[in-house]
Amino acid sequence: MYIKTITIQGFKSYRDQVAVDPFSPGHNVVVGRNGSGKSNFFSAIRFVLSDQYTKLSREERQRLLHEGTSTSTTLSAYVEIVFDNSDGRFPTGRQELVLRRTIGLKKDEYSLDRKSASKSEVDQLLESAGFSKANPYYIVPQGRITHLTNMNDRERLRLLKDVAGTEVYEQKRAESTRIMEETDGKRDKILELLTTIEDRLRELEEEKEELKEYQEKDRERRCLEYALHQRELEDVTNALDEIEAERRQDIHDSNEKRKEFNDREDEIQRYEEALTAAKHSLSTTQASLRQYETERADLVRNKTELECVIADFETAGQVGEHRRAELAEELEVMQQKVDEATARLEDLVQEAEQRIGEEKAAREALEPTQSKLSVLFAKQGRAQQFATQAARDEYLRDEIKALEEHEKNQGRRVEILQNEVAGAKEQLAQLSAKSEQQAQGENDRRENLKKMNEEIAQLQTNIAGMHEQKKELWREEGKLTQIEVNAKSEMEAAERSLMGMMNKDTSNGLRAVRQIAKRLNLDGVFGPLYDLFEVSDKYKTAVEVTAGNSLFHVVVDNDETASKLLDVMNREKSGRVTFMPLNRLKSHSVNYPKANDAIPMIQKLQFDREYVMAFEQVFGRTIICEDLQTAAHYTRSHGLNAVTIEGDRVDRKGALTGGYHDVRRSRLDTVKAAKKWRTAYETDHARHIEVKAALQNLEQEVTRAMGQVQALEAKKRHISDGGEGLFKLLTLPARDLDQARDRVTRLESSLEEAEGASRDAKAKRASYEEELRTPMRQNLTDEELRELETLTQSVESQKKLLFDATQSRAKAVGERNRLEIELSENLRRKRQELRDKLDRLEGEAGNGELQSGEVELRRNELRNLVRDIEQLEEKVSESEGRVDELNSEISKISENLERVQTQQMENTRAIMRVQKNAERYLTKRQTLINRREECNNAIRDLGALPEEAFSKYTDQRSDKIIKRLHKVNDGLKKFAHVNKKAFEQYNNFTKQRDELMDRRDELDQSAVKIEELIETLDQRKDEAIERTFKQVSKYFEEVFETLVPLGKGELIMQKKTDGFIEEESEESLEQGREKSDIDSYTGVSIRVSFNSKHDEGQRIQQLSGGQKSLVALALVFAIQKCDPAPFYLFDEIDANLDAQYRTAVATMIHTLSTSAQFITTTFKSEMLAQADKFYGVFFDKQKVSTIKVIEKEEASDFVETAAQVGQL
């Protein structure tokens, strides 16, 4: 075994966690600067191995924690040593042992293999591995070698005794001495008690004779009293038997009456349920009857209204047909007028166009002639106008320039008018196309109106069918509402009754569980136990008694679900409840009796096998028996709970419970009723919701269909109203067409005028230009005069032609315009109005087919109403008959119920009388039992009776026995002073005397054994000291000779004899051991020689410092050989050695390291020469130490550097 690794954290200078690399099982050397933490490293090992730092105070623990210059504070520290246990020195069975010690300001803890351990366990484990408290020299810290060199002889003797283990012997001897003193004290007390007892025995011997006479009289008294008490006891027992027989008969009669009571209760319950059902049926039937009557009245009113509507339709159809004929005739006349006017208008249009052409040709012919004539007149008057030709030319040029500008303006105007004419013609073409489109739109409108009338008729038919479905659903909804209200009322009543059978906290808890489970959507909540099973009425009382309040326990899938529910319930403070998590319940095997008169209760329950654990928990150890005797038998034989069908229960622990059970307050019946009505309510409610949903869907369908009808009607009205708009649209294009034609005409006329003006200006400009090229004359030339005369005549004739053409054109255009106005504003409008009236009549009547379809629809609806009224008449008749039947049934059930209730009251009074008799029986029985108990107590108080007491006075009369008893009591009065316990006291004191004498003998034997033990301990202690001295002395000589081959050394025991101190070597001590006394030893001295094996040698006080250190080391090695340890720790043991001895010490350690581990620190190179592994200790500026493996050369360099620094 050896130290494998060491981990340090927070201990002294080792602030951070330092894990030392595995040590060599041989020789390990640790080097480092002074103050770097080498000694703290050894202190950490000693801290764990407990040879130091035991029972630390808070201040001492504080000093062990790291205190550096960093700002962080170390609050705890630990040192962990891992031992190689391959040789099995630690009895743990593992290859390694991990030992850790942890300290803090308020803790000091050990752990073994990562498990907490006490200090005593650690000490025992270390001692079992060879770590002796008597020999702590397997760890040699700094200063111990110096301490050994400075020891005097007496201190070395004390050290030898510690190594020999004399402290253990001293402790055992002190304990034996203490026990010996206690034994002497006990023996003295026993002697005093024996003296007192002997004196008391002599006094009791004198009282025994008088007591014997008293006992004879007392024996007779007890026999007489026994005879009297026994006779009374027999009388009381006989009376009890008679009462018990009467009680059993009464119980039998009571059971019969209770059975009748229970049967009658069931009958009453059946009658009440039948009565409730009949009343509910009556209420439902009456509600249906009222609904049928209301519907019948509504249908009769609707039938009357529908008949009136059909009559109105028929009348309106006849009037509409006559009016349509008149309008059609008027429309035909008006159409003829429009056609005639249109033909006349076409002729007038052609004539107007012709006259306009003639007017245009006349104007075009007049304009150039008149222009030339104007030029000649102007030229003629130019001579009077201008004095010179230059003035004339200037004027002509100005006129030519003005005419050119006028010509340009007229040209632009012509261009503008040409564009306007083209635009007007295009607009005229668009208006013509639009007029044709609107005419086509009118035809489409009529077709759409026809289709919409057909769609409206179909939708109205569908709506009528849906109204019939709604009526059926309304009737069903009314019926369901009444049924649902009744079911809910019964369910709430049953649940209130059930909640009244438990405390308020449980009731609130069950309600909260249902709400929380629904709110959190917990699927693992199965509900209260009573909701999860069914049982026949025969066993319900037995089941109720067995389950008790467990019926209200809530079954869940696992404890996690229960925890969620409990958390919310605690947070909301919503009652209390007990949960049964199925994953926590265990199945137990039960040995049921294999007999017909013992039925396992769980076999009579019907439940889902998923909940079997919960039911086994409550009912698994219970059986059902016929009577209490059978139940008690099986309870004793099989250790089960047993219950009778009536509810009397025998507990396997011995308790017997039973009595009357009110069947009217049965929890299971209430649960059954609650479940029944809850199921009925949920079914009715679900159906009610379905009916409501169906009604809502139908309402939506009807609303949608009516919306469609309204939309079609609105669209139809819009199209019908659009007829007038369409007329306006048709009229407006005609008017617009006329206006467009007029505008084209006006624009063309303006264009002609502009073109004529342009031509006139052009002709004038040409004349002026021509005149400008000729010389100015006072008069016209002859040719010009002839032309002037000709042009004058021509202009006059052309003007007359133009006037005539203008008059003809104005007349033709006026007639055309008047006819157009008449056609568009009068004839066409009247024709459209007639068409609209005819369309409205056709729309109101449904364009013939719609009107007849509407009438037929109304007639079908009337037939359906008649059929529905007949059906309702039948239903009303059936409902009235059903009401009469139910009233008769209710009356009959009420009579039967009243009769049974009267019988039940009589039976209840009879049961009450039996109960009162039972109470009287119980009172009388208790009195007799008390009297019997008194007799038994009296007999028991008589004590042990002689044999004659059971037969001596059995045949005598009671009065004689009483007379003789008085006489014997008078004789006993003279013995009033006698010590009645003399015999008992004598026997007790005799027994005590014998026991004390035995105890005294035992104490004497113990004292002898203790004296022998003390003598043996003294002898063993002397032997241990002598043996240890011999071994240490021997090993000292061997070690010293190894270290100093030329010298020798020995240990000398000093002994005090008659005031003188003698010295004995190992040989002389061996020879005189039998005569010696250990107590006479005064010390151990050391004598050595370093250069001779034969001279006397020197005492240690005479040696140099280096020699003293070597001698001390030799002594340490000798002690270690005497009691070897698995490893050794040496802290700078070679510090004071001379150079010539350091090599010898290093060689010895290397030799010893083959069988034990060595960990040493040094500043000398000799120790490094033969070491196996090297470690360096370093510290930083914050004085935090670390340790790590280094190479041998690095360790040598460090030692040499340290030596050089020391020399400086």
UniProtKB/Swiss-Prot annotation:
Cross-referenced SUPFAM superfamilies: P-loop containing nucleoside triphosphate hydrolases, Smc hinge domain
Residue ranges of every copy of the SMC hinge domain listed in the record: 523-633
Cellular compartments per GO CC: chromosome; nucleus
Molecular functions (GO terms): ATP binding; ATP hydrolysis activity
Superkingdom of this protein's organism: Eukaryota
Pfam families: SMC_hinge (PF06470), SMC_N (PF02463)
Alphabetized InterPro entries for the sequence: P-loop_NTPase, RecF/RecN/SMC_N, SMC, SMC3_ABC_euk, SMC_hinge, SMC_hinge_sf
Coiled-coil intervals, chain numbering: 187-362, 400-469, 688-771, 817-903
Keywords of the record: Cell cycle, Cell division, Coiled coil, Mitosis, Nucleus
GO BP term, example: chromosome segregation
Localization of this protein: Nucleus
Biased composition (Basic and acidic residues): 756-773
Disruption phenotype: Does not affect urease function.
Region (Disordered): 748-773
Family the entry assigns: Belongs to the SMC family. SMC3 subfamily.
Subunit composition and interactions: Component of cohesin complexes.
Function: Central component of cohesin, a complex required for chromosome cohesion during the cell cycle. The cohesin complex may form a large proteinaceous ring within which sister chromatids can be trapped. At anaphase, the complex is cleaved and dissociates from chromatin, allowing sister chromatids to segregate. Cohesion is coupled to DNA replication and is involved in DNA repair. The cohesin complex also plays an important role in spindle pole assembly during mitosis and in chromosomes movement. Is unrelated to urease function in C.neoformans.
Protein's UniProt name: Urease accessory protein 2
Organism per entry: Cryptococcus neoformans var. grubii serotype A (strain H99 / ATCC 208821 / CBS 10515 / FGSC 9487)
